[in-house]
């Protein structure tokens, strides 16, 4: 039953069973049905498209919501309805997703779905005490997620079980499949040949309720990999180099498909690393063709039956031979990378596309005056926490004792899953890290998502850290805007941690050991997979077991809040809106809705809205969280100003520059302005996931036709957006700026809304339009 008991939401149904040891958690019947029909579906696609197919096209066209939709779609233009195979959610975004799902009135999820508790654990003292603290401090949220999961048939991975993307790779990802996840690094599953796409919670709700899931047909970027890696080069360096080529927005609305002989030289987890960080170039997803390395990984993780089924259709789990032979005829853009010539890269600071080969990095550090001393090395995260990653890093750590070296900086390690941690412990890797003074944190995101209680006396001090993470935006890891965060492979992080010097190049530089001798670090080495197999440890998986469970959302809770529908559009133009903020420069979802200490409010829209745009830089004063409040004629915080406007019935508008909403998939960055009565986001361009999230929540997201019009907007303007009565696909709207001196400017703006999305806008949100 689903209903309200007094003023509390109450849901009763199933209890939980705990899977101990090596238990099957994937959906074998679903996979058997999938592979049994795959060749037939591919045949139908070939008959319609009448040309050779890329791997991405094979997966996309075999996942159309209905067979009647099978036709040729124009990349980058046509919106298409899909039927993904599964959904994955992490605990910070699952709260809002499940609060929305509760309102959908369904008895169970329509596709296999899971929740993973990895974001709410703060890294501080180490795995044991940190998990204990998180379990207690987040008990209300964990209980809610666990019990709602039980009620609706969703698998639940407890705190400490692992990072969502590593757990998905180990248990759920399968070649040729399609999944969505409420995290921007969901494309990690592309390492097993899956189209895996990061989405907001409302999109996940569409899939979980069995509705069609809409996506603009992506363009295709083909990356031809030649040769094989050697020396210090790692899979991470492939994507670090590519980020420099494509920039943070170069992959927007595109799938990056890797092909060529070089792909077969990379492990499945190495492929996953590359796909994972494709999010940093804005790609819809990334994927690799099925090969022997994927088969071996599937078998090593207890999925021999899945490997056998994939083997049977392996010819259709890669691009057709004609595509590989003439890629520029089938991809919208082709990039070539020779793995045999690739050197390690270090990217940053403050943006993941500032790519520098290690041979040039010292010069860059000195030229820009970056803090040369490396203060902390951090390895792990969903991007680099596989067995192979830790194995190669441990081979560097072991050289400290062997070569009588001292370690100059602290090392923090976040294993990717309990399976990885337990196996690494058995095989001596954890001990190798502990011997050089490392702190082993929980199998969780930790510092990568800002959950790091860093030991420092001066939290605003200018300093440098190097991580094997994916993002390095200002304030992201430790809340310090002056922390220069650089991204590299785990091997390079270990080398720089030992040296304590950003200018150290392990490929050519020597270190001075405790005997005063010059010694060089050997090239890292490590096993792709454990020779004696994985050990699971305590996996921490809870499966819905069918008994009754009761859920309560206390109306006085500061962590959870039931959602009320957003109001529908009133049929009028948006007139005389004050400018809330004109954001200058990079404005990611971290700037719009900060993570770190704010993660605890991710299930409470009113409370989380207090952080809205507090990290955005005001173009008129160069400061953060300081905007002009026309009601008080003073400078105040962004959310506080928006709250005052809302209380007076005043709508407002936000103006921004390029790639607004880059980064995380968190839909809170769209729901917060919607909640605080911001009607319009006007930007030079949007990141894909965030633009979709804005549309889902009934916001108006428009872009400048002439980007120079951004400069016309003044601090005290009242802004009108007109033409909404005739809002239609491809039809521009008009913005009029009423300046304080009585003059005005007017210009047209464009949008990407289709008929269905315009329906969301008119209804007030996608949920309202159901």
Residue ranges of model-derived segments:
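Short, small-residue-biased leader/transition segments that mark boundaries at the very start
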Residues: 2-11
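Flexible inter-domain linker/hinge segments
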Residues: 19-29, 39-44, 50, 59-70, ...
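Long, structured ligand/cofactor-binding scaffold of large enzymes
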Residues: 31-34, 38, 43-218, 602-654, ...
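Extracellular/luminal Protease-associated
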Residues: 259-264, 647-686
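Accessory "access/gating" subregions that flank catalytic or transport cores
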Residues: 132-136, 141, 146-150, 154-181, ...
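Acidic, glycine-rich flexible loop/linker segments
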Residues: 511-528, 690-760, 767-769
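Mobile "lid/hinge" segments at catalytic clefts and subdomain interfaces of large enzymes
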Residues: 22, 26, 91, 174-308, ...
């Amino acid at each position: 039953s689903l209903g309200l008991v007094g003023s509390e939401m109450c849901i009763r149904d199933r209890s939980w069973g705990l899977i101990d040891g090596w238990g099957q958690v994937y959906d074998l019947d679903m996979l058997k049905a999938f592979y049994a029909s795959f060749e037939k579906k591919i045949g139908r696609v070939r008959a319609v498209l009448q040309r050779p197919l890329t791997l991405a096209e094979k997966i996309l066209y075999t996942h159309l919501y209905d067979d009647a939709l099978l036709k040729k779609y124009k990349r980058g233009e046509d919106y298409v309805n899909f039927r993904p195979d599964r959904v994955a959610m992490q605990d910070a975004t699952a709260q809002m997703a499940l609060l929305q799902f509760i309102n959908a009135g369904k008895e169970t999820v329509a596709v296999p779905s899971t929740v993973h508790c990895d974001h709410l654990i703060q890294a501080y003292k180490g795995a044991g005490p940190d998990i204990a603290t998180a379990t207690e401090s987040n008990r209300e949220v964990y209980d809610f997620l666990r019990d709602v999961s039980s009620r609706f048939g969703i698998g639940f991975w407890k705190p400490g079980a692992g990072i969502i993307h590593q757990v998905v790779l180990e248990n759920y990802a399968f070649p040729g499949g399609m999944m969505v996840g409420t995290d921007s690094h969901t494309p990690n599953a592309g390492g097993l040949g899956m189209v895996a796409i990061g989405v907001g919670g409302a999109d996940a709700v569409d899939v979980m309720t069995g509705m069609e899931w809409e996506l603009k047909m992506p363009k295709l970027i083909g990356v031809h990999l030649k040769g094989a890696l050697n020396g210090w080069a790692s899979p991470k360096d492939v994507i670090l180099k590519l980020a420099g080529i494509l920039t943070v927005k170069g992959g927007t609305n595109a799938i990056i498909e890797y092909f060529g002989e070089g792909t077969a030289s990379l492990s499945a987890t190495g492929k996953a690393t590359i796909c994972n960080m494709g999010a940093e170039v804005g790609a819809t997803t990334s994927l690799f063709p099925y090969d022997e390395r994927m088969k071996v990984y599937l078998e090593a993780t207890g999925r021999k039956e899945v490997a056998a089924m994939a083997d049977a259709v392996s010819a259709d789990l890669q691009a057709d031979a004609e595509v590989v032979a003439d890629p520029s005829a089938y991809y919208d853009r082709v990039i070539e990378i020779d793995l045999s010539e690739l050197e390690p890269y270090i990217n940053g600071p403050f943006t993941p596309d500032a790519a520098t080969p290690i041979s040039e990095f010292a010069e860059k550090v000195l030229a820009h005056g970056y803090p040369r001393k490396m203060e902390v090395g951090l390895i792990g995260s969903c991007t680099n926490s596989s067995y192979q990653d830790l194995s190669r890093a441990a081979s560097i750590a072991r050289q400290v004792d062997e070569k009588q070296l001292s370690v100059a900086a602290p090392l923090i390690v976040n294993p990717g899953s309990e399976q990885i941690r337990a196996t690494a412990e058995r095989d001596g890797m954890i001990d190798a890290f502990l011997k050089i003074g490392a702190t082993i944190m929980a199998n969780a995101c930790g510092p990568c998502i800002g959950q790091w209680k860093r030991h420092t006396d001066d939290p605003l001090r200018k300093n440098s850290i190097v991580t094997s993470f994916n993002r390095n935006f200002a304030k992201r890891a430790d809340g310090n805007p002056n922390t220069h965060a650089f991204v590299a492979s785990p091997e390079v992080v270990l080398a720089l941690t030992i040296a304590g010097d950003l200018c150290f190049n392990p490929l050519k530089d020597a270190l001075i050991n405790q005997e005063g001798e010059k010694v060089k670090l050997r090239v890292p080495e490590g096993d792709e997979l454990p020779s004696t197999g994985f050990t699971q440890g305590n996996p921490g998986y809870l499966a819905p077991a069918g008994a009754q469970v009761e859920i309560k959302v206390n109306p006085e809770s500061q962590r959870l809040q039931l959602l009320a529908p957003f109001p529908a559009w009133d049929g009028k133009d948006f007139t005389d809106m004050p400018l809330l903020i004109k954001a200058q420069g990079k404005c990611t979802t971290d700037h719009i809705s900060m993570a770190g200490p704010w993660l605890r409010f991710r299930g409470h829209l009113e409370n989380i809205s207090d952080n809205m745009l507090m990290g955005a830089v005001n173009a008129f004063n160069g400061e953060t969280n300081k905007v002009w409040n026309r009601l008080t004629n003073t400078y105040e915080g962004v959310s506080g100003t928006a709250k005052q406007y809302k209380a007076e019935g005043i709508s407002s508008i936000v103006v921004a520059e390029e790639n607004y909403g880059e980064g995380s998939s968190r839909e809170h960055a769209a729901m917060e302005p919607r909640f605080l009565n911001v009607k319009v986001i006007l930007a030079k361009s949007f990141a894909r996931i965030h633009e979709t999230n804005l549309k889902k929540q009934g916001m108006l997201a428009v872009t400048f036709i002439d980007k120079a019009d951004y400069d016309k907007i003044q601090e005290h303007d009242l802004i009108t957006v007109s033409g909404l009565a005739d809002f239609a696909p491809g039809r521009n709207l008009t913005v009029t700026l009423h300046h304080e001196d009585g003059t005005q400017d007017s210009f047209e703006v464009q949008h990407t809304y289709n008929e269905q999305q315009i329906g969301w806008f008119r209804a007030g949100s996608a949920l309202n339009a159901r």
